Amino acid sequence: NLNISRMNGLSGNYGSSFLNDKVNYTPMILCFAQELFFQDINLEVNKKINKKTRSTFVLANQIYNKDFLEGKTKGENGMISSSIIVADITHKIKKGHTIRMELQNLFSQQLKEAEKLAEGDWSMGLIEYTVSPNWFFTVQDMYNWGHEDSKKRLHYLNLNVGYSKKSNRFEIGYGKKREGIFCVGGICKLVPSSNGFNISVSSSF
C-alpha cells in the first residue's frame, strides 16, 4: 500500500478589525499557502511467511511543522523531516498464544534552524505476548540515541499488563513516557512527560 498525504495552509485576506488583531480572516479555497504543516509518504508491505508467521514492513518519510502543530513559538523547534523504518512480525506459538515483535528506527533532521536542540534519531523495540482471549503482556523501550545533547540520550522503558473481557479492557503499566503527541483511535493530544504507574479502563457500548 502506498499512501501520500500533505497539509498546507490556505492563502487568504485579513479583514479590518477594531483591535487590529487579524481575527477576521477570509481563506481562498484551493489556493494553498507556501507554508507546509505536515506531509507523510509511506509504503506498507504485508507478507505471510507461513501458517504461523506474518509480517508487516513500513517505509515512511514525514515532514512535521512542530511549532505550528503543537502550538509553540515560531522558530522554537522548526520544521522536522524524518525517515522511518518499521518491521512487525507476529508468530502464533500454539492455540491461543501469540508473540509479536516490532522494531522501529527514526532518522530525523531539522530543515530550518531552531532555538532548541534537535531530538535527533530514535529507536524502538517492542515484544507483546498475548494469551487469547483475555491477557496480554508488553515490554517496550524507546531510545533517543541521536539527541544533540548527550545528557538527553535517554531510554523510555515501559511494562504493561492488560486484561480484556467482552467489551471491557483493563490495563496497568509502569514506565517512563516522553512529552509529545499521543494518539488513540484517531484522537490526538499533547501529553507531558511522566514516570510512574498508569491504569486505564475502557469499555464500549
Task: List each model region and its residues.
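Exposed, low-structure sequence patches enriched in small/polar residues
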Residues: N1-F205
